[in-house]
Regions:
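Acidic carboxylate diad motif detector
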Residues: 128-129
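C-terminal hydrophobic helical "lid"/dimerization subdomain
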Residues: 113-117, 162-217
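N-terminal Rossmann-fold NAD(P) dinucleotide-binding loop
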Residues: 41-42
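Generic hydrophobic/aromatic pocket-lining and core-packing "Φ" positions
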Residues: 45, 66, 112-116, 141, ...
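Adenosine-nucleotide cofactor-binding segment
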Residues: 34-37, 49-114
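Glycine-centered, small-residue-biased loops immediately flanking beta-strands
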Residues: 123-124, 149
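NAD(P)H dinucleotide-binding glycine-rich loop of Rossmann-like/cofactor-binding domains
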Residues: 1-31, 35
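C-terminal substrate-binding/catalytic core of Rossmann-like NAD(P)-dependent dehydrogenases/reductases
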Residues: 92, 96, 133-185, 193-194
Length: 217
């Protein structure tokens, strides 16, 4: 097991993968949208692909992140359309009427709203992004009972680490969960400031710091 892949499983991967496998319980043939294609969102997306969801729709503010998601198995992509309503409408169009599960991985209020609005009858929005304390979620209340929509919160992918770390790594070894492709940059520990800048810029997927003697010299 490569150390850089194993390092990812401790947080971002477990959060994203668990939201799909544990919180939502996505099954083959379910329609899934993932809103926010950073490390957590892409982990969720790969997990949905691994269980046979179809379509799996990637949604992000930037075309480059949507393209990265397609390279990891997304069957379609939507670039943020300027509002929650417009973005959700695009997802509903691509999915043929809405998704069974919309996984929200940004923590932004509008993205959460888009997740709810993207779901079909009896669909669920799974909120894994952590919002600011003052963030409020506004959705058409009537659609919750009328459409039997659900809103599910997920912290750390509803995971039990002693079980789920091993499951995730087993699926990685099988080739169905290409976690190594999340590592976009590998830097020595001495370049930690550059690593932080890369993450803040949005250019990186996941940056792994090498703490070995060779990596810090």
């Amino acid at each position: 097991m490569p150390f850089d892949v194993a390092a990812l499983v401790g947080c971002a991967v477990t959060t994203g993968v668990g939201a799909v496998w544990r919180t939502a319980g996505v099954r083959p043939g379910d329609r899934v949208a993932v809103i926010g294609c950073g490390g957590v969102g892409l982990s969720a997306l790969m997990a949905a692909v691994a269980v046979g969801a179809e379509p799996v729709i990637a949604v992000d503010m930037t075309q480059s992140k949507v393209d990265a998601a397609k390279a990891l198995g997304a069957s379609a992509g939507v670039v943020w359309a300027g509002s929650a309503e417009a973005t959700a409408e695009a997802v509903r169009e691509v999915s043929g009427g809405g998704v069974d599960y919309a996984i929200e991985a940004t923590g932004h209020g509008e993205a959460m709203q888009a997740a709810v609005l993207s779901t079909r009858n009896r669909g669920a929005a799974v909120l894994i992004g952590i919002p600011r304390e003052e963030t409020m979620l506004s959705v058409p209340a009537r659609t919750i009972p009328r459409m039997e929509r659900r809103i599910l919160g997920s912290i750390y992918g509803s995971a039990r680490p002693e079980r789920d770390f091993l499951t995730t790594l087993d699926v990685y070894r099988s080739g169905r969960l290409p976690l190594d492709r999340l590592v976009s940059h590998r830097l020595p520990l001495a370049d930690v400031n550059e690593a932080i800048d890369l993450m803040l810029s949005g250019e990186a997927l996941r940056v792994v710091l090498d703490t070995s003697t060779e990596g810090t010299s």
